[in-house]
Structures are given as C-alpha cells and as structure tokens.
Amino acid sequence: MPRIAIVGGSGVYDFPAENKREETVKTPYGEVKITVGVVGDEEVAFLARHGKGHSIPPHKINYRANIWALYELGVERIIATSAVGSMNPEMKPGDFVILDQIIDFTVSRPRTFYDGEESPHERKFVAHVDFTEPYCPEIRKALITAARNLGLPYHPRGTYVCTEGPRFETAAEIRAYRILGGDVVGMTQCPEAILARELEMCYATVAIVTNYAAGMSGKKLTHSEVVELMQKKSEDIVKLILAAIPLIPKERRCGCKDALKGATG
C-alpha cells in the first residue's frame, strides 16, 4: 500500500520506479488510473494530473476523483509538481520554489467533497477545514532540505496565485497579483491542495519556474516554452523528489491529519 504519492504536473508524465503496476481506482467521482511502483524502500503512487501527454486542460481536471483515488489507495502524503510563471524578479526560470501560500482566483471548479446530502458518498455533511497553512510543513521541510543538499537553485517559500486558465494571464492581472503578494502563477493548485486537506492528507508542492509571467519580459507566452524548460529540468525534478522521500517522517505529527476536527457540526 503506497504511503506517498507524486502528482506530476505539466511536463512530468512519468516517474522512475521499480516493479511498476497500473491500478484503476473507482471513486464516487469516476475512475482514475494510477501507477504504483517501488522507490527505495517505499511503495509510491504516481498520477499524471493532466493525463498522459497533457490531454486534460487545468479547468477540466477531475481533481476530486484524483485525490479520492489516492486516498482509497492508502496514500497519506502527496508531493506535487507545478510549472509556474514568475512574478517575482528574484525567482528566475529554472528555479525551484517550495510553495507555502496560495491565493485562489479559480471560479468554476468543484472544490469540496462535502456537499451535504448531495455528496455521492457516505460523508453527507458540510465541512469548513482550516487552510491557514495550505501546505504540509513536514513535506515542505523534506523538500527544502533535499534541494539544499543537492545544491539546486531554490526558494524556501513562495505564494502561488491560482488562475482559472487555460489562457495565460493579462499583464494587468499580473500587476494586480503582485500587489496582493503573489510570487508565482499557475492553474492547478486549487482545488487540489484544498481537497487533500479535506481528506486529512499531507500535501506539498515543488513549483518549477518556467518563464516570467505576462508583461514581465515583453515576450509572448507559449506552452511550448513551459514544456521545453520542464524537459530540461526533469532530471533535477526527479533527483529532488527522490532525495526528499526518505526525509519525510513515517509518523505524521503535522496538523494535516486532524483537519476535520472542529470542521463539522
């Protein structure tokens, strides 16, 4: 039973592991295909967020099915990757950012498992989970330590602005997000991080800066540019995650595991 899962974003459609097998997990929100393999002494699950070959746009991803499927497999910890545009001049293309905060500007995505009586499962209640610190401190610490030990260009914190997509942002939007305190911008952290918290799973993300955001460089933004840089950084992404996995404590002492306490009723 995998304790740890990797959710691969743009440019991360597979992960090296031994004895791989494909699992099809049925959830109340649909079926999900997950790869399970062995990394070191850990059984690890891998899920390609956008599907193989980037076939699903960010606003159409079945986030609820994905997170529920990992939960059903017994996953407690999730390491996600996310390609991002930088709004912070200090965060350059090729840098890694271990995210610590989110500003959510998505508008059309289902963002909770707890829809009361309308929930398609036995948890027919309403929950208001605490999201003060959206990312697991224990996984973040492991990622930061691994990045430092490997000598990778990294930033130990960063605020992610999540937009609806699939279009890139306007220059005016980026100026507004910078005023609000955003460092990087992307399209997938919400509701993914929220849903993981609702199921009391630990979740953290390593963001990879692929370009400067709209209006920052004067260049046209292209998805091919994102994929190209992610391919160049793929080896470092794998090294970072492989180095972080053994640093994640077996026993969870973070607040993620108790997210539903006080959230209902």
Curated annotation (Swiss-Prot):
Gene Ontology molecular functions: guanosine phosphorylase activity; S-methyl-5-thioadenosine phosphorylase activity
Any further remark recorded for this protein: Although this enzyme belongs to the family of MTA phosphorylases based on sequence homology, it has been shown that conserved amino acid substitutions in the substrate binding pocket convert the substrate specificity of this enzyme from 6-aminopurines to 6-oxopurines. It seems that P.furiosus has developed a specific enzyme (PF0853) for the metabolism of 6-oxo-purines, next to the canonical MTA phosphorylase PF0016.
Record-annotated disulphide pairs: C136-C202, C162-C190, C254-C256
Protein name, per record: 6-oxopurine nucleoside phosphorylase
Pathways involved: Purine metabolism; purine nucleoside salvage
One of the protein's GO biological processes: purine ribonucleoside salvage
Amino acids binding substrate: M187, N211, Y212, A213
Presence of the UniProt keyword Glycosyltransferase in the record: yes
Source taxonomy: Archaea, Methanobacteriati, Methanobacteriota, Thermococci, Thermococcales
